[in-house]
Amino acid sequence: MSSLLERLHSKYSQNRPWPETIKLVRQIMEKRTGMMSGSHQHLVSCLETLQKALKVSSLSAMTDRLESIARQNGLTSHLSPNGTECYITTDMFYLEVLLDTEGQLCDVKVAHHRENPVSCPELVEQLREKNFEDFSQHLKGLVNLYKVPGDNKLETKMYLALQSLELDLTKMAAMYWQATNASVLEKILHGTVGYLTPRSGGQVMSLKYYVSPYDLFDDTTGASISLSEGHAVPRSLGMNVSVTIEATSAMYKLPIAPLIMGSHPIDNKGTPSFTSITNANSVDLPACFFLKFPQPIPVSRAFIQKIQHCTGIPLIDGSHTFLPHYELVTQFELAKEKEPGTLNHNMRFYASLPGQQHCYFVNKDAPLPDGRSLQGTLLSKIPFQHPGRVPIILSLIRHQVACNTLIGSCVKRTMLKEDCPGLLQFEVAPLSDSCFSISFQHPVNDSLVCVVMDVQDSSHVSCKLYKGLSDALICTDDFITKVVQRCMSIPVTMRAIRRKAETIQADTPALSLIAETVEDMVKKNLPPASSPGYGMASGSTALSGITTPTSSYTSGQISSLFNMGIKERHDSAGHGDDFSKVTQNPILTSLLQITSNSGGTLGSSPTPPQHTPPPASSPASNTKNHPMLMNLLKDNPAQDFSTLYGGSPLERQNSSGSPRTELGSSASGKPKKKRPRTGTEKMKNQTEDDFQRELFSMDVDSQNTIFDVGMAGDALDTPHITPAPSQCGTPPNVYQQAIPHTQANMQRMVRIPSTDAIIPDVTDILSDIAEEASKLPGPGEDCPNLGTPVRDSSSSGHSQSTLFDTDVFQVDGGGGSGGENPYPDPVDLIVDSHGSPNSDSPNTFFNSVDFNPDLLNSQSQSGFTDDLNDDSSQSGDNDFKDFAGPGLASLGIVSGLPVDGGDGKYKMALGADTVDFSIIAGGGSKNLGGPDIQETQSRSQSPLLGSDLGKDRPQKQKVKESGNGGGAGGGLSGMQSAGMEGKSMKRSRTPSSDGKSKDKPPKRKKTESDGKSPSHITNRPFTPPTSTGGSKSPGTSGRSQTPPGMATPPIPKITIQIPKGTMSVGKPSSHSQYSSSGSSSSSSSKSHHGHSSLSSSASGKIKSNKSDGSSGMKIGSSGGGMYSGQSGQSNSQSKNSSQSMGKAGSSPITKHGLSSNVNNSSGSKTKPQGKPSVLMNPSLSKPNISPSHSRPSGGSDKLSSPMKPMPGTPPSSKAKSPIGSGGQHLSGSGSNSTTKSSSGLVSSGSLTQKPNSSSSSSSSSSSSSSSSSSSSSSFSSGVSQNLHSSSKGKSPSRNKKPSLTAVIDKLKHGVGTGGPGSEDPMDGGVGGGSTGAPSHGMSSKHGLGVGEFPTKREKGEKDKSKGSSGGPSDPSKKGGGDSKGSVSTGVAKIIISKHDGGSPSIKAKVTLQKPEGGGEGLRSQMQKNYGSPLISGSTPKHERCSPSHNKSPAYTPQALDSESESGSSSIAEKSYQNSPSSDDGGGSGSRAQTEYSAEKHKKHKKEKKRLKDKDRDREKKKSYTMKPESWSKSPISADPTMAMGGGAMMSSDRASRPTPSFLMGDDDDLIDVPLTL
């Protein structure tokens, strides 16, 4: 220390001047101030914090703050002499901040190099708000524009290049808007340059290129973010890129002048025309244009290569390291979470949704086909040289971001316990750079299911569901696709799939068992082709005549069986006898036949109904459904199966629909039952009883099998694993066949095509689902899993909700996406999201912590979905918009129908009791045009409308006439139509149908009602094939099937009138429907008038048949005709004929203009129909008449059930088979109606039926379906009539008393036809002939039934006069004014009792009613067959086995018919023996009677009388307008009717349950169905 001091002293010993000392001190101080970095950084930040905390309230404070900000950004600043202007400058630009004397901001101007200062609004706003941080960011952005090494000249060139790029991009954005007039959302998702925000101040130009559905919702408020041209779009919304220019090590030729020539695009996409790059307009710069991401995004190796190929500039160097792409996606998603900290996820993530807990394992290392795992990297910016590259780059980035969004939807910070009860496990694994799979356990079976999502581009996601061949269907591919595109969320989609599967499971728990049983039975009992039972078919059988041209099968075993007398078949040797049992079982027969048809349909899915695809495809679908079924199909003529299956296209379409549809087809089997009754021996009856019981136990499974088959058909388009979704969804929407015989097969085939159609059209799916939902109104429909579609749609109303569950899609009722979605299915499909009982949770799907409940419901979401879809934001959105609400979704107003029209329908359904028809018509906004209505409604609205409206309407209709109102009108109409309406149908078809109607004045009235049922079917006019296949029912069946339908002038009218729905209107079908409509319409026309809408027929205006007829006529003529027919039928037939009247004749005829003819001819019968009208009314107008409804379904419910599924297949409805009646399912109109016309009718009927709960709707629909699907078989009576006229079909006039041979031929032809015409006859003849209700129940059944009928008719003259006129079948009873609701059933009995009775013979109905008296048995059966009997297996069962029939709601629909004492009684007897559901025996009873000996008939009659008395009392209580006699059976019928309406399941449940419960509505039905299960 001392030495140091010495040195200092020696060094400074000399005295320095003071100035030098001061200078030295200053130097030291300056150095210290200039060293404020590193160690002083903390002090600097503290000073800045203090400065920010100071309030800027004076001029000096403001200038100090501005100088500080400039200094922080490396810029210089100075003040003007007066101190009110502050300049922040740099070499390339400067800012001018103008202040007043108090320090308040006046303006901020920015001046770039050599440019005049320009005011910047954003900077002004920020400084006025004292937002100095954002102001500082702007300064940084300005500095970065010129952040290039080099002199000012180079910087100027770079700025010019950036400026030219911005001008070009701005012009491109303007051109796109000019060419497309796109909305903000469309610009973002599809715009060539996205949504462009120009550069402002220091914020560079940004392009918004993608927003997910969740981006459109405000997390805090839950409200959707509005994107409109008038409002600024937040820069932070969605995914954005910034357009910049940055220095690079390489030289690039960049344009320094705009390259776009002119101001108009060269195409309709806004593509501009660029000038070529030249030295004059570009320069070489050490810089490049960049699209910069705010945060690096994960991009897979494949997309990086695509981008590099597009730009020609490498994005990454060769040494770059790639990581598992899914790992990068999870990191990216977790980084967006506001919650800090890392998540130890181990690639396992949990999602908590309403009612479900999911665990997702993201398999990041899953090998791709090339053996490598999916690799990717984080991309921060993309270089490019030309503005024309921007659209391509954005398209690729959108695609990648869409994939990332889906994968990222599984990534949540939610934590759940591993042992959480009910935790669902899912594995997400990549299959390619844009395709991945989600594997999970099958909801029903213990097997693995896989959903493959292929993100084709940012707006299209293709989904396929892969399952085992034996696995139950879950939902359609289209449904999944719509859900995904709606929400872009895997958890939401998985929940929707799960809920849909649960609905289906509830509806078809025993499908597998049924399939196995059927298979075993077939293997053991299948006789050789030459065996008498199998091959004995008269060459002239109607079946063979009806054989679809495209069908590779000749009128083989099944047709021969139809042709054979019952005794002959019974007498068949061992195997033949066993096989007889099988074939006699409506369910089994329909199932088997449906399988056949299904295959055929599959093959020709895209072809119109007339062109039935070769049966070759049938085996595939059968195989998918069940090997046994496939084999059986090979032996059986495709025609019969087509008819059976064609009757329930919707069912096929929906995953649940396929099995059920086939079961529903077995409705014809029921008629068979009736045949046995005519000439059957006790031994045979017993066998049939046993067999039915077996079938019933296996019903659900067999339905599943059917589902598989249906799926198989769909599978044609889906992977070999048989993706259930597409298979299920498509088939139902197939065209209805215009040619009767072709139609039968075609219907089935059409369904398959439907599937194809459904995939693109969620609306169709939803419609199908809606129809199915309405078809499966009651728990009793468990058996009729033909209502599989219903399952898809959450059973009945719920099916809709399931398809497009509100929970699934919050957009518009959430359910709307069927779906599609529909189902809608989108339809499973997004349908009954409103309050569908099957809905797992409220309409708001995202109630859970992880999902925004409003996400999917918001309009913007809709827009998003639409925009998200390549089609445009409207595509997806519109579909869901069509599902504007759960209600609309339920209505099936998804995409096919205009939202307004759909709403109108829905509103109408809600609004008017009697306006059922008008509702449908109104809903379709084409009330006057049956075809239009059918097409519109059936395709989109009718099914869903039927379901939804059915719900609403049930309430309204309940008020009106419970049984007669609404769907019952359609359904009942259909059923009675089967019996009496067959005649009417014929008559409708041709003027001579009037003669038929006249033949049986009292019964005729019922018949007319039945005819109206066909009319309803006619409603399906748009799908005349349905009519021929099912709707053509009595009159049309035989005729329409062949030349008759085509020859009959009314058919051409029908075709014209029903251009859309009618497909080729299936001249036979069309005319049949219309004929039927005409005949019934004559009488039912009045009732139509009374109804003046669906309601009209449904209105309990038994007494005012004339008024009903007139109103019905009006409706029919106005295009509400379909409904009108239903309505007229309901009113006219009140009890017995009500169904047939309103259903077939009135509406269709009216629609076709045949109404006047029919009206006139039926005019005298209007009054008798008046009673039946009530029956019809129940199904049409009143939920109350639900039983009636069911009844019609009962008679035709089995058909109806199967048909209901068909409604699920509105297009198939076109195919018209009983299923075609699908429309009828909903409205009781016709199969055709189901898709379009039927949809309209069904819609209306359904609407009315819906009040009956899904059950009632189903019943009505079903009956209607059956009726429409088998115009001739709209009811047994209808069959008789139809057989007379339809069977003969060719003869425009339906002679009331054709020769027995002619009648038999007609019946056979109708049955054998299995085609549009044949199907109807079959439906009518078999279903109708047997019970009218059974015939109504299922097209296929009807086909079989027809065969049986011919046999029965051969057995007795009843068949002759009644059989031909519907006498052999319940329809005949229906025809008899006496038999009311039980017409179909009663008719069958009556026919038996009075084979030669002709139409009047139907009065034997009392006896039939007695059989219906076996209602106790029916109830018990109903309980057994809850949901499925009618709609699916149950219905076929019922048709095939009296017991099943009686059990099933399908039988109950018969009960509706049988509610008219005679029909019900007859069938009740039969079905009573066969099953506990004997109460419903009206329809099944008739067949049972056929099967049973006279002794048993007597006993059953007595029992049924008792039951009838009770039932009548019950019905009276239920406010059924039908006569007490018919209602005496009707109670069971009523309940069964409900069941029928709701489906066979419903029938059982509903049978025991009062009509009111059935009338409760779709919701009720849905509830019932699960209960049944």
Curated annotation (Swiss-Prot):
Pfam families attached to this UniProt entry: Med1
InterPro entries assigned to the protein according to its UniProt record, in alphabetical order: Mediator_complex_subunit_1, Mediator_Med1
Compositionally biased tracts (Basic residues): 1496-1505
Motif (LXXLL motif 2): 629-633
Motif, LXXLL motif 1: chain positions: 588-592
Compositionally skewed regions (Low complexity) per UniProt: 1025-1038, 1053-1085, 1092-1116, 1124-1143, 1155-1164, 1226-1277, 1461-1471
Annotated Pro residues bias: 606-617
Amino acid composition bias (Polar residues), ranges on this chain: 651-668, 791-804, 835-864, 934-944, 1176-1193, 1278-1290, 1420-1435, 1443-1457
Residue stretches of biased makeup (Basic and acidic residues): 678-691, 949-961, 1350-1362, 1506-1518
Main location class: nucleus
Biological process terms in GO annotation: positive regulation of transcription by RNA polymerase II
Keywords: Activator, Nucleus, Transcription, Transcription regulation
Kinase as UniProt keyword: no
Region (Disordered) residue spans: 595-691, 774-883, 928-1564
Biased composition (Gly residues): 963-973
PANTHER family given in the database record: MEDIATOR OF RNA POLYMERASE II TRANSCRIPTION SUBUNIT 1 (PTHR12881:SF14)
Similarity comment text for this entry: Belongs to the Mediator complex subunit 1 family.
Protein name: Mediator of RNA polymerase II transcription subunit 1
Species name: Xenopus tropicalis (Western clawed frog)
Gene giving rise to this polypeptide: med1
